[in-house]
Amino acid sequence: MKSSVEQLSPTRVRIKVEVPFAELEPDFQRAYKELAKQVRLPGFRPGRAPVKLLEARFGREAMLDQIVNDAVPSRYGQALAESEIQPLGRPDIEVTQKEYGQDLAFTAEVDVRPEIALPDLTGLSVSVDAIEATDDEVNAELESLRARFGTLTEVERPVATGDFISIDLSAAVDGEDVPNAAAEGLSHEVGSGRLIAGLDDAVVGLSVDESRVFTAKLAAGDHAGRDAEVTVTVKSVKERELPEPDDEFAQLASEFDTIDELRASLREQVLQAKRVGQAEQIRNATIDALLERVDVPTPESYVQAQYEGVLHSALSGINNDEARFNELLVEQGSSRDAFDAEARTASEKDVKRQLLLDALADDLKVQVGQEDLTERLVLTSRQYGIEPQQLFAYLQENNQLPSMFADVRRELAVKAVAQAATVTDTDGNTIDTSEFFGKPPENDVTDLLDDDADGDAGVDADGDTENSAEPADADSADAAQGAG
């Protein structure tokens, strides 16, 4: 077999393949033997029918089509291996010569990972927002904790924001009651905005057994999206009494003896939550700083696949109803054109990030260990509320493990670069990234990039490097949702 590669663009190639007919003859012999076992021809025992008779009965062209259909995928894979091409997506294949006794010829056009000239990482610096825990934020946490230990007391007064009420609801469209839209004895915290838009405003000021009618859009059922006249009747009103924020409360609600110690602990919790956000900001700022230094060509089909994943996620929550989706966009002050433009821009940026990180992982010789994969599996399963074993089984069944592997490999590449970067906050403080990403390796990242690495960066879950180019982010999320 002979193959050659023509570079059509930085992200697309055409592979020309010629397969000598002699290489296909064993395939023909096997196909005829299988066919002979399956057919019954007068005068011949099963499996003994002559080839000439089988050709006359079923047609040589039909057999040729079957052989070619079976041969092209394997020969395409062989051509990929010989040329060391890393494809992105499925190829567009065209058979250019197919004749019995003649060489088989076909072309395959496919998107590929582009060659990326990696930037100089020497002196890479990024800036992120400074973090602090304000008194207001600490007080809000304290109020939330007090609310958990509060008691509800029934009161004889009109409803006010913050009250807990029991209500009856009914709805009508065009004067006709809406079936299944009535409910009795619903509990609601006034001001939470959890039940129906407009409900909180409608109940404030009402006393027990008083009613009010307001207009709201129905979210589900046969009348979903239509305006309905909603009637709400207040059945009871309770207010929450909060414990005093003193030492006694601190001992009741925590392991601390004093309210000052509890406040200090809450302040640290606020800071810790902000550190998580700061770590993500460092990650994104590091990638953005790299993208500013390098040009990353983007395969259009790869971007399109990413966009379709975004659209699929957006539509899945409304039963893939595109008409309703377009209406919701208009209600939110947007449009389908604006959504498509924003989604495509975001998809292109995501693809650039993925391709850049794959190239970095190659040059940094990133190795993904079992511990790295296990950690990601546990974190993802917690995020979606399922058991790690359940998620692993789903990923394996749906061939999503290579995507998760690729995602973890990219994260390790970002981690390595962030460890070597100089990170400061907007107040001018230098941030110790080891708190987020651990200590840097003994060999500096910039030294590794200067090495004459051949790009063979370990193996993926299937034992080769091809799948490191997969768009893992969306796939992993979809897989986790499916497993749930």
Swiss-Prot record:
Enzyme Commission number(s) of this protein = 5.2.1.8
Bias (Acidic residues): 444-476
Q: Which GO terms describe its molecular function?
A: peptidyl-prolyl cis-trans isomerase activity; protein folding chaperone; ribosome binding
Which protein is depicted? Trigger factor
Q: Which GO terms describe its cellular component?
A: cytoplasm
Q: Tell me what organism the protein belongs to.
A: Mycobacterium marinum (strain ATCC BAA-535 / M)
Q: Which UniProt keywords apply?
A: Cell cycle, Cell division, Chaperone, Cytoplasm, Isomerase, Rotamase
Comment field on protein domains = Consists of 3 domains; the N-terminus binds the ribosome, the middle domain has PPIase activity, while the C-terminus has intrinsic chaperone activity on its own.
Role, per record: Involved in protein export. Acts as a chaperone by maintaining the newly synthesized protein in an open conformation. Functions as a peptidyl-prolyl cis-trans isomerase.
